[in-house]
Swiss-Prot record:
Coiled coil: none annotated. The keyword Protein biosynthesis does not apply. InterPro entries: G-protein_beta_WD-40_rep (IPR020472), NLE (IPR012972), WD40/YVTN_repeat-like_dom_sf (IPR015943), WD40_repeat_CS (IPR019775), WD40_repeat_dom_sf (IPR036322), WD40_rpt (IPR001680), WDR12/Ytm1 (IPR028599). One of its GO terms (biological process) is maturation of 5.8S rRNA from tricistronic rRNA transcript (SSU-rRNA, 5.8S rRNA, LSU-rRNA). One of its GO terms (molecular function) is ribonucleoprotein complex binding. Disulfide bonds: none annotated. It comes from Drosophila mojavensis. This is Ribosome biogenesis protein WDR12 homolog.
Length: 419
């Protein structure tokens, strides 16, 4: 049998966890040269016998998406062509559709969605609030240098609270009255000695963390009255807030910070390391060494994996739970320039998005390292930040002075997590 050359047949079993698309569990003889296209035709022919409509599927062979010929995939995995091969098929995630373009006056370096709103930060030192359909609600001055990161603290029908960080070495906390569309700065957070590149609010919205070019990780109260500080009265009177905790350990800029739970933080740095911090112990719990500067990192609560963005065009997957944490689980190839930003889906266990200096966003499945699921096109210059906090929308900001909004048709309202 000449299956090694793509000629000849392979015995396969077709499996799925989506029972509505299940086919009889019997061996099927298929050509070794088949790709996803031929497998879709074959599978849909089987399903039509059950009266089902045509559906697009992706195929997992030994835990990785099939992206070429089956025989080439098996050869790469060193699998014998004489074995019976199990192929798992899943309904293909639908392509997100471009919905809107939000035009700003300068580079958009920070984006964060929550509820009905998109919060943006720009290189003209301003914050902006928008709807997903492009209605501009508010421009907020206050910082004295470009904005680098933003996050929502809380949001309801009446008020929104959020935090922004800047190259002006500060973080600023804001309160927005939605009905009157009025905003005020409630605290200026001082303590960093260089620009503040990253910020993240804790899951319980009690604290937020910042990472800076001064290599320090700082923890701040996110409450309106910082009663836990000995200097609370002075801080309240002056509007200046000081950090609750300062953690030292990185050797270069902290480019990414994310809460894994209310007492555990993930940071990524230009010093080529990821660190997991235990705030109860005020120290480092786990360190993952990489071979590239980390521009962004994202941890998934659904699968406990970490994906990183780096200067060498690649994204990498790590597992912080194992003793081999520094071992790269997968490398994702597809961007043609620095990858600046990355974020996991909060509802889809295997999906994440990235944005890069090649002007492109990409939607990935972590089981498909050789190619993204989709290219999300629209930016005319490099992408600086991407956000998928609202499962219904992927939003990104870029050096073309725009925010691009892509609508995901698969998102379910009941899965949405809005603060």
């Amino acid at each position: 049998m000449e299956v090694e050359n793509g000629e000849g047949q392979v015995q396969v079993h077709l499996k799925t966890k989506q029972e509505q698309y299940a086919v009889p569990d019997v061996p099927y003889a298929i050509e070794g040269s088949v790709s996803t296209t031929e497998l879709n035709i074959f599978l849909n022919a089987l399903l039509q016998n059950k009266g089902a409509e045509s559906v697009d599927f992706d195929f997992l062979v030994f835990d990785e998406y099939l992206r070429g010929r089956l025989c080439d995939h098996l050869r790469e995995k060193a699998i014998s062509f004489e074995d019976s091969i199990e192929i798992e098929y899943v309904e293909r995630f639908p392509a997100p559709e471009p919905q809107d373009c939000l035009l700003h006056d300068d580079w958009v370096s920070a984006v964060k969605a929550s509820g009905k709103w998109i919060l943006t930060g720009c290189y003209d030192n301003t914050l902006n609030i928008w709807t997903y359909k492009g209605k501009h609600k508010l421009t907020i001055p206050g910082h004295t240098a470009p904005i680098k990161a933003v996050d929502w603290i809380s949001l309801d029908n009446e008020n929104g609270r959020f935090v922004s960080t800047s190259q002006d070495q500060t973080a600023m906390m804001w309160q927005w009255n939605i009905a009157s569309n009025a905003v005020e700065c409630v605290s200026v957070c001082k303590g960093h000695e260089r620009g503040v590149d990253s910020v993240c609010v804790s899951p319980d919205a009690q604290r937020f963390a910042t990472g800076s070019w001064d290599t320090m990780l700082k923890i701040w109260s996110a409450e309106l009255e910082d009663a836990g500080e000995s200097t609370a009265k002075r801080a309240k009177e002056s509007g200046v807030r000081t950090p609750r905790m300062t953690l030292q350990g990185h050797r270069e800029s902290i480019s990414a910070v994310q809460w894994m739970d209310n007492n555990t933080l993930l940071t990524g740095s230009w010093d080529h390391t990821l660190k997991v911090w235990d705030l109860n112990l005020e120290g480092i719990k786990t360190e993952i060494s990489t071979n590239k500067s980390i521009f962004d990192a994202s941890h998934s609560k659904l699968n406990n994996l970490i994906v990183t963005a780096s200067a060498d065009k690649n994204l990498r997957l790590y597992d912080a739970r194992t003793n081999q944490g520094s071992v790269v689980r997968s490398t994702y190839l597809g961007h043609n320039a620095w990858v600046q930003t990355v974020m996991w889906s909060i509802t889809e266990e295997f999906l994440f998005v990235s944005g890069a200096y090649d002007n492109q966003n990409k939607l990935w499945d972590c089981r498909s390292p050789k190619a993204p699921l989709y290219d999300l096109l629209g930016h005319g210059e490099k992408v600086l930040d991407i956000d998928w906090s609202n499962p219904k929308y992927i939003v990104s900001g870029g050096a073309d002075n725009t925010v691009r909004v892509f609508k995901s048709s698969k998102a379910t309202v009941e899965n949405m997590e809005t603060k």
